[in-house]
Amino acid sequence: FENLVWCIINLSYLSRKKSQNTYKKERFAMVNLITGPKGTGKTQQMIELANEKVKTSNGNVVFIKKSHRNTTTLDFGVRAICMEDYPDILTMDEFVGFLYGMVAGNHDIDTIFIDSVLKQADISLNNISAFMTSLSKISAENTLDFFISVGAEKESIPDIDSDNYNVLN
């Protein structure tokens, strides 16, 4: 009888443990876009979203910018990364590798914000489709969300109408 009770307790524990571990894997991760021409408040909207996200997130929130400008309004809980500090990251592939390395080094990252994505490395409207595909892959593999701001009208961004992307404006 004791062995039976022990087995039931262990099975219950393992079942509960498995459901806790699979929660993060079952959550649907996504690439979210904020679009619009220069001067339409995309950066401020991204900062507000990051500040809200850090209050409700169970993981770490990262905010990637080109420069140190306007980072003072970010909540102290948001990890700000300025790409000026990494001048050798010049290509889209290097930038994607940087993201993979960041996620591999910190499995607690829940959300990554990338402000002014067209100013990062050599990302342009010509190759943003490939970049967003890479983000979707990273998002799915690591169950994290991306929020990116693009300094262009929604209509000028190729392949934006995919189920993998959510346009917020």
Where are the language model's segments positioned?
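Context-gated lysine
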Residues: K17-K18, K24-K25, K38, K42, ...
